[in-house]
């Protein structure tokens, strides 16, 4: 494909236009009085959302150079979301402010490399200050963090705190759509383990990059599956039931994995493969735990069982299974409660008789996974559009709360960044030239989140920033007043603030040091076919050869 090139200031200007287009769409959502963004969908009703990462993913610009700038800022949102689960809008606003200041200085002749060095030194100092200011979180602070992350929705904050109280902070909490209008919390049997899907082609939700099945069957085995012949009988049996199938095995690869992917993508069977957790004897124990939870049987070489003799009675059953790239969560039915209790009692007896510290640790982990259960927040709303938006808010609140438990909390509303900005004055005095300018770029950018929160609340952003700097208090966007935000319960997770700042500087420093941009030349639109048929008469799509699975392909 032919390429287009832009150089020097022209290239950076194009990237900045693209960045601003995306950032301006995202920044209106920040704060408790942030606005919504309407996203047109190819099918169905449009989505009305308030989530920065979701908005960023939807934006594609017509100009290829501007689109590259937009995609660079998209990376800020997605990286922050992946690592912290929240703070995407803050990271985007910070990155935009740093890029604008950085490009203004490079256009005036500053060295991009020296600017970057100064910016990195400034961020290192701010991160250190965040660590010193952060406070551990417990009790009502968990509810407050969740409430702030959910845009001031106190019901969401209360529900997240209640879920964490019931299954502990380390427990499994999932979010699903309710069949009623009410949002409810339910604690059920279930477990999660750190293994994801064997192939990304099993994904059923492209936006969240997860595979999710309701009322699924589970095939549990400690064998490695490579030959498709081993799976043909059970696949044909499951296909007749119409239920999804999840295969937990030592490994599924080769011809077997390829066949599962093809059948899933053709819509023949809802299926996914996951590597069984742990290793060796501990893997067998983990599979046995999952079998108890789901009412299934482990197809094991130790018991001389073969895959081609598997029946429906051997398969486990789960109310819902969610599989991400790195984790699998199984929500079981209520029928397994007694069996799980017996299994936990058995493991406790084994724990009492164990002298090995390592073995005791692993046994305690198994007990926690089985006994802890899964808290399910069932989200209800009058319309599908509102339901999707509310579900995103709850997921953000959950992620922010987990981040707060990890690294503590700081005052929210952008006030902590403003207060830490003062610590950069000493660093700036130690540096000279463009490195000092880099520190000043970060100093000015740190006020951008608070300024935008104030603007979204209908206040004058510059006046609010000046008042917060002078008074040392924070701006409460809900009331329009100034107060101690820690005491008011307006809190941010320190991890979210830290990652948002670090990711913003990372992308901003890359963008201001760019000298050449290479983009694909857009393909000209195809001319309509002659003869009056705009489709040109599509030829038949030749059938794909079977893969040795009668009745499946």
From Swiss-Prot:
The keyword Nucleotide-binding applies. Its main location: cytoplasm. CDD domains: GroEL. InterPro entries: Chaperonin_Cpn60_CS, Cpn60/GroEL, Cpn60/GroEL/TCP-1, GroEL-like_apical_dom_sf, GROEL-like_equatorial_sf, TCP-1-like_intermed_sf. GO terms for biological process: protein refolding. Residues 533-542 have a biased composition (Gly residues). It is an enzyme of class 5 (isomerase). It is found in: Cytoplasm. Residues 521-542 are annotated as: Disordered. It catalyses: ATP + H2O + a folded polypeptide = ADP + phosphate + an unfolded polypeptide. GO terms for molecular function: ATP binding; ATP-dependent protein folding chaperone; isomerase activity; unfolded protein binding. ATP binds at residues 29-32, 86-90, 413, 476-478, 492. Its EC number is 5.6.1.7. Keywords: ATP-binding, Chaperone, Cytoplasm, Isomerase, Nucleotide-binding. Belongs to the chaperonin (HSP60) family. Forms a cylinder of 14 subunits composed of two heptameric rings stacked back-to-back. Interacts with the co-chaperonin GroES. Together with its co-chaperonin GroES, plays an essential role in assisting protein folding. The GroEL-GroES system forms a nano-cage that allows encapsulation of the non-native substrate proteins and provides a physical environment optimized to promote and accelerate protein folding. This is Chaperonin GroEL 1. The gene is groEL1.
């Amino acid at each position: 494909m032919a390429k287009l090139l832009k150089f020097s200031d022209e290239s950076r200007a194009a990237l900045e236009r693209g960045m601003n287009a995306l950032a301006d769409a995202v920044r209106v959502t920040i704060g408790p009085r942030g606005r919504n963004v309407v996203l047109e969908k190819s099918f169905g009703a449009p989505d009305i959302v308030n989530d920065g990462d979701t908005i960023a993913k939807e934006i594609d610009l017509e100009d290829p150079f501007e689109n590259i700038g937009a995609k660079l800022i998209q990376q800020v949102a997605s990286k922050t979301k992946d690592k912290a689960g929240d703070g995407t809008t803050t990271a985007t606003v910070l990155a935009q402010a740093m890029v604008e200041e950085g490009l203004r200085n490079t256009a005036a002749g500053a060295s991009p490399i020296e600017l970057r060095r100064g910016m990195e030194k400034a961020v290192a100092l701010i991160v250190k200050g965040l660590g010193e200011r952060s406070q551990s979180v417990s009790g009502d602070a968990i509810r407050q963090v969740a409430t702030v992350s959910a845009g001031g929705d106190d019901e969401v904050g209360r529900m997240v705190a209640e879920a964490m109280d019931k299954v502990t902070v380390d427990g499994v909490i999932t979010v699903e759509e309710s069949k009623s209008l009410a949002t409810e919390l339910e604690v059920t049997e279930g477990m999660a383990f750190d293994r994801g899907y064997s192939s990304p082609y099993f994904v059923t939700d492209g936006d969240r990059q997860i595979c999710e099945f309701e009322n699924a069957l589970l095939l549990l085995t400690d064998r490695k599956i490579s030959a498709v012949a081993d799976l043909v009988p059970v696949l044909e049996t499951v296909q007749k039931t119409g239920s999804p199938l999840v295969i937990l095995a030592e490994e599924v690869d080769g011809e077997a994995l390829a066949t599962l992917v093809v059948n899933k993508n053709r819509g023949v069977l809802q299926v996914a493969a996951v590597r069984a957790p742990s290793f060796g004897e501990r893997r067998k124990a983990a599979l046995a735990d999952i079998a108890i939870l789901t009412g299934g049987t482990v197809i094991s070489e130790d018991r001389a069982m073969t895959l081609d003799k598997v029946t429906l009675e051997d398969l486990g059953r789960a109310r819902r299974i969610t599989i991400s790239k790195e984790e699998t969560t199984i929500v079981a039915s209520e029928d397994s409660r007694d069996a799980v209790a017996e299994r936990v009692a058995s493991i406790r007896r084994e724990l009492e008789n164990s002298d090995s510290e390592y073995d005791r640790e692993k046994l305690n982990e198994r007990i926690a996974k089985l006994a802890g259960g899964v808290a399910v927040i069932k989200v209800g709303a009058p319309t599908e559009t509102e339901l999707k938006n509310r579900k995103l808010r709850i997921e953000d609140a959950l992620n922010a709360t987990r981040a707060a438990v990890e690294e503590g909390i700081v005052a929210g509303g952008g006030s902590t960044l403003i207060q830490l900005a003062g610590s950069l004055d000493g660093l700036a005095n130690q540096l000279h030239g463009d490195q000092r300018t880099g520190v000043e770029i970060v100093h000015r950018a740190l006020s951008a989140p608070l300024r935008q929160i104030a603007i979204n609340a209908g206040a004058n952003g510059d006046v609010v920033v000046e008042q917060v700097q002078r008074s040392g208090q924070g701006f409460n966007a809900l009331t329009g007043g100034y107060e101690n935000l820690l005491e008011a319960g307006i809190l941010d997770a320190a991890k979210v603030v830290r990652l948002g700042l670090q990711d913003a500087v990372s992308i901003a420093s890359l963008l201001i040091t760019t000298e050449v941009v290479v983009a694909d030349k857009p393909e000209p639109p195809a001319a309509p076919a002659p003869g009056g048929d705009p489709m040109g008469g599509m030829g038949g799509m030749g059938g794909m050869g079977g893969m040795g699975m009668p009745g499946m392909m």
